[in-house]
């Protein structure tokens, strides 16, 4: 990457402060752009779901991995819950969505409460592994909530065979004017697919481990037995290990990282597979160099740019994210490491600019919180708009969850030191209510950015990108108008 006219900025920059200049290009199609990463994680999209309790869980992890990204399970989740989640993610199908399934005697009320867990908006009625019918929200409208699903289900359903190719599945659903169908293998339900899902399976490549299973990562903090927890997570089968704290350039992190690295290396000697370590967060050269020297493969970059984070307003500490990513990526590349840009992502352009600055992948949190796949319950505001609650990982709410085993006095003391929002409404976009819808939007933007730069890969994109500086008026000029002026 270079700045337009070789200008060297005299101040630090956010994503809004910069733009990319189009260059001569031989890339004729967005689909000619390969967005696979080279940081050793194995993702085919440069998207990482942040290790936030309100964002990353089992549903999110399997859905994102199916499209090529990876989710990081938060460090606050008990290990037995993490183990169960990893097992279920690894068992999930790499192409077909996991169905929301109920028994024939399930009540309408319970079935309707389960539908928002997935974006396909239906449940499959199953008995002895075989689907009997489908229930949608329309089927349950104005029906007694204690009625049973077998009374209202649609038994005349289209069932697709696992061996069918995506195009034939799409055509079969289109002919029947359906958006959703169960997929069977030898008569047994193994998943469901939508028309969009059939299309996506021809565009995206899932992020899978050497055994062909969906990938998932997990985080550990720097307090407590980080070494022991890291070993447990590795044995569970995670695909990237994140060592995470808000201030990554501190002695405790630099003491913990070598311990985690040693556990990882011993695991690699035993299994033949070297799991990448990501650590952070930092915002400059010195922090990046120290983390790489201590044993990380990937440096997480960002202090305070996230929507749920109040660090900059509370402390004055942080750095505009574009400049932080640019400097850290330069230092990491010189040391043979990589960076993830963590925070401040609000539009597809921000993802593209982070990659142009040298990030291998981009971490997204709050933007993905407002989707069906995030862990929270779907709620409805007074205006009728559906939303999910989100909160920061240094907020009083997160601290309370993290310190549940401490005494009441200690928990009250720690709650005084919060840096994050404890409750924020993240509204579902009516046009993009599922995380896959957002992934479609992001990848379309990033692929198009690469074609403007004449790049076929992320590495070429970083090499060829030409970045200019703009005023706030310049940024506003590029915003679309949804009504006339």
Predicted stretch roles:
Residues 75-78, 128-129, 136-140, 165, ...:
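Short, ordered loop/turn segments at secondary-structure junctions
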Residues 1-24, 102, 161, 171, ...:
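Alpha/beta catalytic cores of nucleotide-metabolism and tRNA/nucleoside-modifying enzymes
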Residues 24, 29-44, 48-52, 81-118, ...:
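Bateman/CBS regulatory modules and CBS-like beta-alpha motifs in cytosolic regions of diverse proteins
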Residues 66-81, 238-250, 297-315, 345-378:
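Glycine-rich phosphate-binding active-site loops on the catalytic face of alpha/beta enzymes
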Residues 59-61, 227-236, 283-301, 341, ...:
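Catalytic cores of alpha/beta
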Residues 43-49, 95-98, 210-219, 260-283, ...:
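Short beta-strand/loop segments at the ligand-binding rim of alpha/beta enzyme cores
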Residues 29-31, 77-87, 146, 190-207, ...:
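Active-site-adjacent beta->alpha loops and helix N-cap segments on the catalytic face
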Residues 72-76, 101-102, 122-124, 159-161, ...:
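Catalytic beta/alpha-barrel core
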């Amino acid at each position: 990457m270079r700045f337009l006219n070789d200008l060297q900025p005299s101040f630090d920059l956010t994503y809004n402060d910069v733009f990319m200049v189009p260059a001569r290009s031989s890339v004729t199609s967005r689909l000619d752009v390969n967005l696979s990463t080279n940081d050793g994680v194995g993702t085919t999209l440069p998207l990482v779901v942040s290790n936030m309790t309100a964002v990353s869980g089992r549903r999110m992890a399997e859905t994102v991995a199916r499209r090529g990204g990876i989710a990081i399970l938060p460090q606050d989740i008990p290990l037995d819950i993490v183990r169960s989640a990893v097992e279920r993610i690894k068992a999930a199908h790499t192409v077909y969505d996991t169905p929301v399934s109920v028994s024939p005697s399930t009540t309408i009320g319970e079935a309707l409460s389960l539908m928002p867990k997935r974006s396909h908006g239906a449940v499959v009625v199953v008995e002895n592994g075989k689907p009997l019918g489908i229930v949608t929200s329309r089927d349950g409208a104005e029906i007694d909530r204690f009625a049973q699903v077998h009374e209202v289900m649609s038994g005349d359903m289209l069932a697709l065979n696992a061996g069918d190719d995506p195009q034939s599945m799409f055509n079969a659903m289109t002919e029947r004017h359906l958006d959703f169908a169960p997929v069977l293998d030898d008569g047994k339900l193994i998943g469901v697919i939508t028309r969009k899902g059939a299309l996506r399976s021809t565009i995206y490549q899932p992020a899978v481990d050497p055994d062909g299973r969906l990938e998932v990562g997990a985080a550990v903090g720097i307090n407590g037995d980080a070494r022991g927890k890291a070993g447990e997570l590795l044995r569970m089968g995670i695909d990237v290990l994140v060592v995470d704290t808000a201030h990554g350039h501190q002695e405790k992190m630099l003491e913990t990282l070598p311990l985690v690295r040693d556990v990882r290396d011993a695991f690699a000697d035993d299994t033949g597979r070297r799991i990448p370590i990501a650590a952070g967060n930092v915002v400059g050269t010195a922090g990046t160099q120290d983390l790489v020297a201590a044993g990380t493969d990937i440096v997480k970059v960002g202090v305070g740019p996230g929507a749920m984070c109040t660090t900059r307003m509370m402390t004055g500490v942080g750095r505009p994210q574009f400049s932080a990513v640019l400097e850290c990526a330069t230092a990491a590349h010189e040391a043979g490491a990589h960076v993830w840009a963590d925070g401040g992502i609000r539009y597809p352009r921000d993802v593209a600019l982070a990659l142009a600055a040298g990030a291998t992948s981009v971490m997204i949190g709050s933007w993905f919180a407002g989707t069906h796949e995030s862990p929270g319950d779907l709620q409805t505001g007074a205006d009728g708009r559906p939303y999910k609650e989100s909160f920061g990982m240094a907020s009083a709410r997160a601290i309370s969850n993290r310190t549940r085993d401490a005494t009441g006095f200690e928990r009250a003391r720690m709650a005084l030191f919060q840096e994050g929002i404890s409750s924020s409404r993240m509204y579902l976009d009516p046009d993009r209510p599922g995380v896959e819808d957002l992934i479609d939007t992001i990848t379309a933007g990033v692929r198009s950015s690469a074609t403007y730069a004449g790049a076929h890969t992320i590495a070429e994109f970083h090499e060829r990108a030409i970045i200019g500086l703009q005023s706030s008026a310049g940024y506003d000029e590029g915003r679309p108008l949804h009504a006339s002026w």
